[in-house]
Amino acid sequence: MKQLIDKIERGEQALSFTALSRFMKSPAEFVRYKTRPYKKTPGMLEGQYAHMRLFNPCSAAFEYRIGKTTDKNDKRIKLSQANVQNACRYVYNVRSHSKYKNIRQTARRVETHETIELDGYKLRRVLDIDAFDAVYDVKTMGAADITPRKFKWKIYDFNYHVQAAIYVAQYPTIAENIQHIEFLPEFYWIAVTKTDCVIMQCSKELIVAGFHRLQQAFHDWQRCIAADAWKMGSEFYLRHDELIIQP
């Protein structure tokens, strides 16, 4: 684990948003994510398959296997027929949205994997749809989560606003991105369930809040290194007075 931390500090290893969000829950959660097998739920697999069907359909057969097989050497991700049906509902609802066709026509790139640098840290991002002056991110979710009240809760609980900030960042420092916030691309969530699809814009104010939360995460990362607190749970974030970085 120490080697991984050292690589991140030296800029030799990039942090994904998933790994960063685990750290924002607790240092111990980050360590578990990085050191133990990560078992994805059926909902996660359906969401991933829906993404591939939307943005890279030709690769779906090479990445996923539908149904059972006797071939023990088949290393593809296993999906049941029910998983596929649910994923196809997501895909259909996104494509059926009145604005989606125009969004795809204006897109210059889809499912773009990039590594950026912010305040000296390398971060990985995957832009579902990059449309020059706007970035769109598809979120698959349950029916209750798509309501404005519940989705607002998910934004803060899952740090979606931090993800939005990372995805629209254009400058090498957080301060510069906040200073030039009006020049950054717009950010939209394409929130889709098995029965509905809603496109919601992330306000500039919320993106700024995401940058501030990211800045706090970088500060907490340094505190964690200084105190060697990688085994701590969420109580780590309640002990700022005891875990101060020495000048």
PLM segments and residue spans:
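Short acidic, glycine/proline-rich loop/turn micro-motifs
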Residues: 146-152, 199-202
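Secondary-structure boundary elements
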Residues: 100-104, 131-137, 172-183
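A short acidic, glycine-rich active-site loop
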Residues: 152-161
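Hydrophobic (often cysteine-bearing) scaffold residues that line and stabilize catalytic clefts
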Residues: 42, 46, 163, 210
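Metal-dependent nuclease catalytic cores that hydrolyze phosphodiester bonds in DNA/RNA
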Residues: 1-126, 235, 239
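Metal-dependent nuclease catalytic regions and adjoining charged, substrate-binding loops involved
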Residues: 87, 156, 166-247
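Coil-to-beta-strand transition motifs
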Residues: 120-124, 131-133, 195-197
